[in-house]
Amino acid sequence: MRLSLDSFRAGLHPGSTYRVAFSGGLDSAVLLDLMCQVRRVSGIGVRAIHVHHGIQPEADAWSRHCAAVADRYGVALDILQIDGRSRPGDSPEAAARTARYHSLEASLDPGDILVTAQHLDDQAETLLLQLLRGAGLAGLAAMPNAVPFGAGILHRPLLRFGRRDILAYAQERGLSWIEDPSNRDERYDRNFIRRRILPQLAGRWPAVAANLTRSAGHCAEAAGLLDRLADTLMAAATAADEPGTLVLEIVQRLQPDEQRLLLRRWIHKRGLRAPPAKLLERIRKEVVETAGDRTPMIAWAEGTVRRYRHRLHLLPPSADFDASWTAAWSGETPLTLAGNGCLHAALCPGPGIDPDKWRSGRITVRYRRAGDRLEPAGRRGHHELKKLFQEAGLPPWLRDRQPIVCIDGRIASVGGSQWLASEFAGAPERVNIVVHWTP
Ligand SMILES: Nc1ncnc2c1ncn2[C@@H]1O[C@H](COP(=O)(O)OP(=O)(O)OP(=O)(O)O)[C@@H](O)[C@H]1O
């Protein structure tokens, strides 16, 4: 489609404040020019944002170029300084991109529309890259035209226009831009596809970019439908008294493909990246489908799926929890438990620790040790903590994480004030020390 002010405006997502992601390259130079023209005719607010990655030696010169261009348009430019370096083993391209998107996302105010300059050929490259990675529908949907992003929206108004139309527009308008030398580096997959593969395909199928983009559109529609189906399955399977937990029996009644869809959505909604397909299938077979009363679990880098008492639980990783940790506590100020929330103590009416015993003893906090026993307040006889936890239906993976408050080395309370030792418990009708645990 020919790129003109009218054809561009016709597809622009409605809004009143736009932030142009301006790298200084050809595509975003055209986008900024178009947005400034729209501003002239319709009075929208336009600001530009440039991300300074601090990686390439030219980064300072690019920032200066962007500032000069923005100045000529009379547009305010925010320069976001980020550390776009990758960690060993990560792709530098992906690390810079992730850091850039995070900083752009955080910079938006409510209602802002962030516009970026990806076009039809970028979309075709993205689809090919996703196919080569073996992506599922969500990946093949490639880049959406508009999605919620931070406090605002991310919108790509040039997706309908090809690289050639964008170049023609820039030349016609006499725009200036900078060329990033790394765009020619064919060690990067995207550059290889753009420079070697797509021209070959276009020699035989001139409409290749438009057709691939159309396929991405079909995938996007199907992916949206499946998301809605997954939400319906999840609403039906979620335990009413424990949001975030699924009722095993309901999940088991679904077909295998529905189970996979539901598991992926459940993990995604928790903000975790789904495991690879093979591992997801193991979760389905070994955790969901296994018969009997077993309590299987499967962990991957992003989390753990566990089955316990007819429910499925999803836990984020807990890297810094140390079961051998112990500390003295004044009881006056909250105590932070590494990787396990915090404790605080307050005087409250009702069951709790006798304030006199609390003040006169030496308080320490630790975790469970083999053979720990307790006589619960109001009950006769000592019981192993393990038995008390089982009796209360506490899932096994939470048992070692219950903080144990000791007075002079003897257990006074467990899990905040969930279990109180009779030897330290105050009279329940009086005001006592209540230990709260916020995991
Ligand atoms: N340094 C930058 N500062 C501000 N915006 C940028 C910067 N780099 C890129 N952008 C914005 O992102 C768009 C896409 O850039 P580019 O194609 O280089 O990114 P990419 O790494 O391939 O990411 P994507 O997959 O989103 O296209 C640009 O057109 C521009 O709008």
Curated annotation (Swiss-Prot):
The keyword Ligase applies. CDD domains: TilS_N. The lineage of its organism: Bacteria, Pseudomonadati, Pseudomonadota, Gammaproteobacteria, Methylococcales. It catalyses: cytidine(34) in tRNA(Ile2) + L-lysine + ATP = lysidine(34) in tRNA(Ile2) + AMP + diphosphate + H(+). Belongs to the tRNA(Ile)-lysidine synthase family. Signal peptide: none annotated. It comes from Methylococcus capsulatus (strain ATCC 33009 / NCIMB 11132 / Bath). It is found in: Cytoplasm. Ligates lysine onto the cytidine present at position 34 of the AUA codon-specific tRNA(Ile) that contains the anticodon CAU, in an ATP-dependent manner. Cytidine is converted to lysidine, thus changing the amino acid specificity of the tRNA from methionine to isoleucine. Keywords: ATP-binding, Cytoplasm, Ligase, Nucleotide-binding, tRNA processing. One of its GO terms (cellular component) is cytoplasm. It is an enzyme of class 6 (ligase). This is tRNA(Ile)-lysidine synthase. Pfam families: ATP_bind_3, TilS, TilS_C. GO terms for molecular function: ATP binding; tRNA(Ile)-lysidine synthase activity. The gene is tilS. ATP binds at residues 23-28. Its EC number is 6.3.4.19. InterPro entries: Lysidine-tRNA-synth_C (IPR012796), Rossmann-like_a/b/a_fold (IPR014729), TilS/TtcA_N (IPR011063), tRNA_Ile_lys_synt (IPR012094), tRNA_Ile_lys_synt_N (IPR012795), tRNA_Ile_lys_synt_subst-bd (IPR015262).
